């Protein structure tokens, strides 16, 4: 009888365990998703404004919380502290986050970044090329895609960070410093590139296109979240895809919407959209190769303290499923 009781207890625990595991993956057990969003003009902002994420998730009993950031690196603090589930960031924060051991996955390519990053100088600065930055003060957000772009652009002409004075500033602070002449140059991304050139007379010294330097952007998810709620990761990507498609099909309306939300001149917005085509795609081998080259460069220049294999954080499973479901006729 004692043996039978032991077997019965074991079976009960086994069944309880199965039930618990099933519940952990059930979206009905999920109460809230936290989405990080930057100041960029991204379809993520369109979806936020139109309430598409709320429509898709709240009908399943899941609340949507938006968390605003100025750049990518602080978002990794949120991921590491379990205060963020999804985010979209540039290439450099992804590499720094992986090198720091933060647990996340890249689940989609959100832009190629060819024209999205550049180095600004004032029109009358006298600086004609990247070599002219030697000895100058340059504003940049540490660990951002602009940070990586600056280091690579300097390296291309035989300079390093030791040849310039790096002033680490987040975009809002950097804009003031650049406009009042406290710094000589600013390594930054859109929409700031268009805003400064069109409204304040700045000029783009170089960008990704002129230097052939890619700065791709990625959609990220916290690894534990993706393991426990895979269906919700697919749902997120499908909603984002809806916003990407809508922007491409309603470009003028999208420009009006961004202009209203950000209080920007529509012509500035149109220029930003011309330079930053949104994507929601599988992370290709070419992008992985470019990321690995960036990671190796950052290790060589001591921006990160260990070598990493960037493939370790790539997971195309969710985007493949999301795109398949979208093509079969279901946006959400």
Curated annotation (Swiss-Prot):
> Where does the record place it?
Cell membrane
Q: What Gene Ontology terms describe where this protein resides (cellular component)?
A: plasma membrane
Q: Topologically, how does it sit relative to the membrane?
A: Lipid-anchor
Keywords attached to this entry = Cell membrane, Lipoprotein, Membrane, Palmitate, Signal, Transport
Expression induction per the record is:
Repressed by sulfate and cysteine.
Q: Does the keyword Aminoacyl-tRNA synthetase apply?
A: no
Task: Give any GO molecular function from the UniProt entry.
Answer: ATPase-coupled transmembrane transporter activity
Question: Where does the signal peptide begin and end?
Answer: 1-17
Superkingdom in the source lineage? Bacteria
Predominant location = membrane
Residues bearing covalent lipid (S-diacylglycerol cysteine)?
Answer: 18
Lipid attachment in record (N-palmitoyl cysteine): 18
* Membership in a protein family: Belongs to the bacterial solute-binding protein SsuA/TauA family.
Q: What does this protein do?
A: Part of a binding-protein-dependent transport system for aliphatic sulfonates. Putative binding protein.
* PANTHER family on file: ALIPHATIC SULFONATES-BINDING PROTEIN-RELATED
Protein name as annotated: Putative aliphatic sulfonates-binding protein
């Amino acid at each position: 009888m004692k043996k039978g009781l032991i077997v019965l207890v074991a079976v009960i625990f086994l069944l309880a365990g199965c039930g618990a595991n099933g519940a952990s993956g059930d979206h009905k057990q999920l109460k809230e998703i936290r989405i990080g969003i930057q100041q960029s003009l991204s379809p993520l902002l369109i979806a936020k404004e139109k309430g598409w994420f709320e429509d898709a998730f709240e009908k399943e009993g899941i609340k949507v919380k938006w968390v605003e950031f100025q750049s990518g690196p602080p978002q990794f603090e949120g991921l590491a502290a379990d205060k963020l589930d999804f985010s979209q960031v540039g290439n450099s924060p992804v590499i720094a986050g992986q090198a720091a051991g933060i647990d996340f996955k890249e689940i989609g390519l959100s832009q190629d970044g060819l024209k999205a990053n550049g180095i600004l100088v004032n029109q009358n600065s006298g600086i004609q090329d990247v070599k002219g930055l030697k000895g100058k003060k340059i504003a940049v957000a540490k660990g951002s895609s602009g940070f990586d772009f600056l280091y690579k652009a300097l390296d291309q002409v035989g300079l390093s960070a030791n040849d310039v004075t790096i002033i680490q500033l987040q975009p809002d602070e950097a804009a003031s410093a650049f406009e009042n002449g406290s710094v000589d140059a600013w390594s930054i991304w859109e929409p700031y590139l268009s805003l400064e050139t069109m409204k304040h007379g700045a000029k783009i010294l170089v960008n990704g296109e002129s230097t052939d330097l890619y700065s791709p952007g990625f959609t990220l998810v916290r690894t534990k979240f993706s393991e426990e709620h895979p269906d919700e990761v697919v749902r997120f990507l499908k909603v984002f895809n809806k916003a990407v498609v809508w922007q491409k099909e309603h470009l003028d309306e999208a420009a009006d919407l961004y202009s209203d939300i950000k209080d920007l001149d529509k012509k500035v917005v149109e220029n930003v959209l011309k330079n930053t085509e949104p994507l929601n795609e599988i992370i290709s081998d070419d992008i992985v190769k470019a990321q690995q080259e960036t990671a190796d460069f950052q290790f060589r220049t001591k921006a990160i303290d260990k070598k990493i294999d960037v493939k370790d954080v790539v997971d195309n499973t969710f985007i493949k499923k999301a795109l398949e479901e979208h093509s079969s006729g279901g946006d959400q």
